[in-house]
Amino acid sequence: FVANRMAHELGHNLGIDNDRDSCSCGANSCIMSATVSNEPSSRFSDCSLNQYSSDLINYYGCLLNEPLRTDIVSPPFCGNYYPEVGEDCDCGPPANCQNPCCDAATCKLTTGSQCAEGLCCDQCKFIKARQICRKGRGDNPDDRCTGQSGDCPRNS
């Protein structure tokens, strides 16, 4: 019951309104129901999911942006799965790394590799310039590879 109420209040913090009578989640009660039920739900309704998705796209699209390496304030640590300043790549500890483009012990690219990951990286090589790496939404144009990086830049 406590977890259900916490999920409900978190929903409000994320900008989700209480469900209307027409909302459905495939259960007797949904997380964002305006009334408390004896049978707490673990599901958000179609209305809640639509509202959250719409708000995320229309108002909080920046949350979908990948952080820059320079945004991280802790010292770089090779083996944490996140490429930080000074690392070319980071595929985790050597025992777990499954990326042939990345040397897990050094967090540097393997010999002959141009990239280790990203929408513009294919088999350790940069995808040629002008290839679409992310379709545009709304008025935003398609994002295209530069041919100089494995990352897909935002062409907004």
UniProtKB/Swiss-Prot annotation:
State the free-text cofactor note. Answer: Binds 1 zinc ion per subunit.
Q: Where is the active site?
A: 9
Q: Which SMART domains match?
A: DISIN
Q: Which stretch carries the motif Cell attachment site?
A: 137-139
Requisite cofactors: Zn(2+)
Q: What is its EC number?
A: 3.4.24.-
Biased composition, Basic and acidic residues: where in the chain?
136-145
> What keywords are annotated for this sequence in UniProt?
Cell adhesion impairing toxin, Disulfide bond, Hemostasis impairing toxin, Hydrolase, Metal-binding, Metalloprotease, Platelet aggregation inhibiting toxin, Protease, Secreted, Toxin, Zinc, Zymogen
Segments carrying the region annotation (Disordered) are: 136-156
Task: Please give the Gene3D superfamilies that the UniProt record associates with this protein.
Answer: Collagenase (Catalytic Domain) (3.40.390.10), Disintegrin domain (4.10.70.10)
Q: What is its main location?
A: secreted
**Peptidase M12B domain boundaries:** 1-67
Disulfide bonds listed in the record: 23-47, 25-30, 78-97, 89-107, 91-102, 101-124, 115-121, 120-145, 133-152
Please tell me in which tissues this protein is expressed.
Expressed by the venom gland.
Report the GO terms under cellular component. extracellular region; plasma membrane
Detail which positions bind Zn(2+): 8, 12
Spell out the Polar residues composition-biased ranges.
146-156
EC main group = hydrolase
Question: Self-association or partners: how does it assemble?
Answer: Monomer.
Q: Which family does it belong to?
A: Belongs to the venom metalloproteinase (M12B) family. P-II subfamily. P-IIb sub-subfamily.
Known function:
Snake venom zinc metalloproteinase that inhibits ADP-induced platelet aggregation (probably by binding integrin alpha-IIb/beta-3 (ITGA2B/ITGB3)) and degrades fibrinogen.
Q: What is this protein called?
A: Zinc metalloproteinase-disintegrin jararin
Say which species the protein is native to.
Bothrops jararaca (Jararaca)
